Curated annotation (Swiss-Prot):
An annotated GO BP: tRNA wobble position uridine thiolation
Reaction equation(s) it catalyzes: S-sulfanyl-L-cysteinyl-[protein] + uridine(34) in tRNA + AH2 + ATP = 2-thiouridine(34) in tRNA + L-cysteinyl-[protein] + A + AMP + diphosphate + H(+)
Region listing for Interaction with target base in tRNA, in residue ranges: 98-100
Disulfide bonds: 103-201
Lineage per the UniProt record: Bacteria, Pseudomonadati, Pseudomonadota, Betaproteobacteria, Burkholderiales
Keyword Transferase included in the entry's annotation: yes
Family note: Belongs to the MnmA/TRMU family.
Site for Interaction with tRNA, residues: 128, 352
EC number: 2.8.1.13
PANTHER family, per database record: MITOCHONDRIAL TRNA-SPECIFIC 2-THIOURIDYLASE 1, TRNA 5-METHYLAMINOMETHYL-2-THIOURIDYLATE -METHYLTRANSFERASE
Protein name as catalogued: tRNA-specific 2-thiouridylase MnmA
Gene that this sequence comes from: mnmA
GO MF: ATP binding; tRNA binding; tRNA-uridine 2-sulfurtransferase activity
Annotated active site: 103, 201
Source organism: Paracidovorax citrulli (strain AAC00-1) (Acidovorax citrulli)
Length: 378
């Protein structure tokens, strides 16, 4: 989606290559482009894991090459109140939240968008791999997958609404990552070969267990298998997620030929977290029934069109980078919905997002609250 005619567009410059090429493309189209660098975390500015200072230097260097102004804006208080506090609450409740989803909804497309409008922007743009399309038949703005299937980020953007989408551009969503890198090198961007960021949104890459340990209380408890046998002790339920295989401290795989099925040599996976009893349940084998679900329930739904989809056939992702899975919307009322899947889904995790699609169009989604066993399929 291109912006026309000439407009004042504020670009969120992160210091990465995607937002840098975003700013360049819009400048090439003749728009008045202003860059804003968002600082959203300052608890440990001097830590070896905090990259915001380096990222700002990179963003400023990019702005200089492109020939645009850049502003440094601090949203640390908003991030802590709206994103990080909820992130901690979810972990303390035994769920596994997705901070990138909340960060997009509350910071990049709320706090940042509001600030951009206050400084005279007509639209904002970010380096997300997604697309926005206006549908003249319905009068609605649609959120579409990015053209590069390996980089599509629509899953993280499913909480955006019509007002936000109408004022947002995703220029690199029309490109593949290889093209973005090529453009960056051709115009001499200093961060053309900078690696993609990972880790917690705006907090960066760091040892997760050590980081989480600073903010939440935790209590060790038993690790039990599906037959109730005690296999060891966990360090706190918050530090584990469903489907986890590494770091359980109960032994490894003795026979690499028995990875998917059960048996005494199969690997162990986290299957359940019994918060009330402080028990971590593990099972052997990737395809153990406790790891498979045919149904799920979700809440706190956001529908991009402003209304829930009709009951019937659909497709969904229950985690990022997952292939779309055929499903049926069995109920969608208010903020709640339920899905059933003809093919069992693996390690459906409370706290993660279930995001619905109609082809390339992202319909919205919600937070998974529960998943049903394989024998509960409709």
């Amino acid at each position: 989606m291109t912006a026309s005619p000439k407009q004042r567009i504020v670009v969120g410059l992160s210091g990465g290559v995607d937002s840098a090429v975003t700013a360049h493309l819009l400048k090439q189209q003749g728009h008045e482009v202003v860059g804003i660098f968002m600082k959203n975390w300052e608890d440990d500015d001097d830590s070896e894991y905090c990259s915001s200072n380096v990222d700002f230097v990179d963003a400023a260097a990019v702005a200089d090459v492109i020939g645009i102004e850049i502003e440094h804006v601090n949203f640390a208080a908003e991030y802590k109140d709206r994103v990080f506090a909820e992130f901690l609450r979810e972990y303390e409740a035994g769920r596994t939240p997705n901070p990138d989803v909340l960060c997009n909804a509350e910071i990049k497309f709320k706090a940042f968008l509001d600030h951009a409008m206050r400084v005279g922007a007509e639209k904002i743009a970010t380096g997300h791999y997604a697309r926005v399309r206006h549908n003249p038949a319905t009068g609605l703005h649609e959120l579409l997958k990015g053209l590069d299937p390996a980089k599509d980020q629509s899953y993280f953007l499913h909480r955006l609404n019509q007002s936000q989408l109408s004022r947002t551009l995703f220029p690199v969503g029309e490109l593949r990552k290889t093209e973005v890198r090529r453009i960056a090198e051709e115009i001499g961007l200093p961060n053309a070969k900078k690696k993609d960021s990972t880790g917690i949104c705006f907090i960066g890459e760091r040892p997760f267990r050590e980081f989480l340990n600073r903010y939440i209380q935790h209590a060790p408890g038993p690790i039990l298998d599906d037959r109730g046998r005690r296999l060891g002790q966990h360090v706190g339920l918050s530090f584990y997620t469903l489907g986890q295989r590494q770091g359980l401290g109960i032994g490894g795989v003795k026979d690499k030929g028995a990875q998917r099925g059960g048996g005494e040599h199969a690997p162990w996976f986290v299957a359940r977290k019994e918060v009330e009893r402080n028990v971590l349940r593990v099972v052997q084998g990737h395809d153990h029934p406790w790891l498979l679900s045919h149904t799920l329930q979700a809440t706190d739904a956001n529908w991009v069109a402003g209304r829930p989809p009709a009951a019937g056939a659909c497709a969904a992702k229950t985690r990022y980078r997952q292939q779309d899975a055929a499903c049926t919307v069995t109920q969608a009322e208010g903020g709640d919905f339920a899905l059933s899947f003809p093919e069992a889904q693996w390690a459906v995790t409370p706290g993660q997002s279930a995001v619905l699609y109609d082809g390339e169009v992202c319909l919205g989604g919600g937070v998974i609250t529960a998943a049903g066993p394989v024998n509960s399929a409709a």
